[in-house]
Amino acid sequence: MTRIVVLDGSLRPSAGNTARALSLCTSSFDASTEVDRIAVAAYRGSVGEMASRLCAADGLLVGTGTYWGSWGSPLQQFLELMTPYEATEVFFGKPASVLVTMDSTAGSEVASRLAATLVCLGCWTPPFGWMALSRAGVALAERAPEAARDVWSHADLPVLAHNLVVAARIPRAAFQAWTVERATPIDSPWPAAHSLPPAAPDFL
């Protein structure tokens, strides 16, 4: 069984566009793929428990909305708390794909920066391993499919899902890590993150 941890780093983890996009993506996983889904804004475990769940994963799927050109604050908090696990078995050598939602702009930049951040933690990105779904792009695909052939849409989610699972099933290569200034992990309760009520236009 291939285990994928799905992290929802958005501010509306229960009912937002990112939550729906992640659900659409994971619906393409085959029966041999087990999903451990974590809504970071609603997570109430400990830092150590979070690290253990990531450590048990064969791959990661990380989702977030776009907030003023960046990812959600719950995801930023996650990255800060997980920094002591940089280049450890929690992240090292694991494929990580990124799925970003946005209204109309900045999502591609957020996705590329997030993928690069995960690489610095020790992960690697599969082919076609990150994408940004926009309200504008989805609307275009619905109204003028020919004009939207080169714009990310729902139809691209199975590719992202397939490539992540294929990458997660590749035998772990003998990668090497450079030296990092390692912080000491703190196994404390996960700090409560704030979330937002539904407000952004739904498009998924």
Predicted regions span which residues?
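Short, glycine-/small-residue-rich phosphate/pyrophosphate-handling segment
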Residues: 92-140, 152
